Amino acid sequence: MTNTKKSKQKNTVGNKVKKTNTNKNNNNNNNNNNKNKQNKINNKNNKNNKNNDSNNKNNNTNNKNNINIKNKNLKKVENNKSLKVISSNKNKNILNNLKKEEKVNSNDILIQQQQNREKEDITNEDDDEKYNLWNPKPTSSVSVSSSKSSKSLKTTDLQNEMSEKLKGSRFRWLNETLYTTHSKEAFKEFSEDRSLFDQYHSGFKSQVESWPINPLDLIIDDLSSIKQRKRIADLGCGEAKLAERLQHKHTIQSFDLVAVNERVTACDISNLPLKNESIDIAVFCLSLMGTNFIDFIIEAERVLVKGGLLKIAEIESRITDINAFTNEIQQHGFNLIKKNEQNQYFTLFEFSKLQKKDQQFMRSLKQYQKLKKQQATNEPVLKPCLYKKR
């Protein structure tokens, strides 16, 4: 009995030991499983960390690449800007070179034109050109050697020369306009734009300097010899030089399209602000301009006293027929006293106003002569001064 009990006790103890062993084994297994799970988790985390690291590296490389690309783009933009600056500088240089070439070419053209004009002046035998003072010849000839040396002149000198030529051209254009326009229209235009008259008289002064003699000087000398004080009307006076030089000797009234100074009264010469028979001497010095210049003669006859003098200076090249011209003046109540044809450029005339009883006969006679003359030729007695285009 005791043995059986002991064996039973041993078995129970063994079973307990087995159970504890199995429990230990189970615990060990569980621990191992947990460790394995933890290892797996750790491995996953490590992998994730590695992936994150690799991603971070990739992001860093991408950022670096992006920065490099931006830097490259910035460099390209800077390069483009520099290229633009360089190209603009090149364009400026090209433009400057072109301007220099244009200046040189214009200088060469100017010299060539001067040479061509000299050749024309030598070969041209046209009388109208010879005596037309509105297109004067150069005061001194330019040789071939001097024309070559003129290429070395400063640009400013050539520009000044070109400017003077342009002024001359402007003057001739205005001069032609005055000759081919009715005086009423000319008075309106010049009144509205004073600069036109200033340009005209600036050019006129330049032209007069090249003339061998100014007809106004001859008229002033003639009037200064008159001892008795006279009332004189300077019709188409310009700057009123006649009044300036003779105001101490005579009473002078000066009229023109524009009053350039205090001595001048602005008006249309065909409608003078003067009373009938209030003037002793009327002067037209190169001022029978306009398509209605005969109206100027009629107005002069109105304001002159009986026996009053009419003095006219006219360019020789304008007069188509000197007898026809004097007849034209005489039929409006004047008688030719004298004429001076000694100067090859100008002709000077002096007429006196007729008495009333003589005028009717003279007008009928001169009208008949005029009709006969017009049948023979249709040319006007005074040609307009036209600018010859070269």
Swiss-Prot record:
Function field: Probable methyltransferase required to silence rDNA.
Pfam families: Methyltransf_8
GO BP terms in the entry: methylation; rDNA heterochromatin formation; rRNA processing
UniProt-listed Gene3D superfamilies: Ribosomal RNA-processing protein 8, N-terminal domain, Vaccinia Virus protein VP39
Encoding gene per record: rrp8
Subcellular compartments: Nucleus, Nucleolus
Taxonomic superkingdom: Eukaryota
Swiss-Prot/TrEMBL keywords: Chromatin regulator, Methyltransferase, Nucleus, Repressor, rRNA processing, S-adenosyl-L-methionine, Transcription, Transcription regulation, Transferase
SUPFAM superfamilies per the UniProt record, alphabetical: S-adenosyl-L-methionine-dependent methyltransferases
Binding, S-adenosyl-L-methionine: H201, G236, D256, D268, C285
GO molecular function: methylated histone binding; methyltransferase activity
Biased composition regions of type Low complexity, renumbered to the chain: 22-71, 140-152
Protein name: Ribosomal RNA-processing protein 8
InterPro entries the UniProt entry points to: RRP8, RRP8_N, SAM-dependent_MTases_sf
E.C. designation(s): 2.1.1.-
One CC-aspect GO term: chromatin silencing complex
Alphabetical list of CDD domains matching this protein: AdoMet_MTases
Residue segments, region Disordered: 1-85, 106-160
Family assignment from sequence similarity: Belongs to the methyltransferase superfamily. RRP8 family.
